[in-house]
């Protein structure tokens, strides 16, 4: 492990630092673009929406905490969108959407900044595996 002196991490950043962070994740994607999708999955089905919906439906059917009725509206909204939410996996199976090596946890606190707010490196690489690039992009927008 390498120690990087004066490096900082942040939970939230200003727009300028966010810009640097977005550029760094873009560079990260570009550097990994030629690595084949055959890289192993570190967390199977981590970003697989079909799998996640199946898990949700199983949890709803069990209603272990007895609260499903309290969130029925939200569950109905999810079901209305389920087909669209699973579109990426279908397109992938049809050979119409590729998977690329992605970070899969793209958030601003998974990079180290210098004193001027420039990104030194992307960290927390335990989730690097094949996924959809737009998942990394969306994950970063959620936190950036």
Q: Which stretches of residues belong to each language-model region?
A:
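ATP-dependent phospho-/nucleotidyl transfer catalytic cores
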Residues: 4-19, 24, 34-103, 110-116
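Active-site activation/catalytic loop segments of kinase-like enzymes and analogous catalytic loops
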Residues: 134-144
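Activation of the activation-loop gatekeeper triad in protein kinase-fold domains
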Residues: 123-128
